[in-house]
Amino acid sequence: MNPERPKKPDMLLWEETLFKDRDIFELDHLPDQFLHRERQLDSLKFCIRPALQGGRPVNALCLGPPGTGKTTAIFKLFEEIEAHSTRIVPVHVNCQMDSTRYAVFYQLYKKIFEHAPPSSGISFKRVFEKVAQHSADEDKVLIVALDDINYLFPEKEVDHVLYSLLRAHETCPGARMGVIGIMSELA
């Protein structure tokens, strides 16, 4: 006496959902509205403002507890920069993945030239010169966000990276670069 039950559709094929937008759960989701960070975004915009007139931006450090929106704030800022300026080239570098001076400049090169530098036989000096010369020749200002900059602290790699970025104009007159460091507060 087992009356035949209606067969449920396979759960994986259901079109119904409780969520209006599943994309908000994706790790790379960037919200349309970024609430409660207006003061921090305004401070970052103030630092970037000189670059809009072709000057050097003011360097900044975003410091706060993990998961409070530091990286998202930078992505929102960079989104706005790319929408309103061709003079500024914003580059986000994840220092957990790119933790050497060469790796940081590799990412800059890739962003500027829209392809990676040759995979072998090219020195840091050559990559550095190409990036700095492009900044000078094309009248571009590079804004480099070093996310999780604390990963550059071992071996004092941070000294080499910052020195190369902030003193590029000495090697290549006219090169303009600014740095935004992003770091979680140390417990």
Could you describe each region identified by the protein language model?
Residues 24-42:
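Dynamic helix-loop-helix/coil hinge segments at AAA+ ATPase domain boundaries and subdomain interfaces
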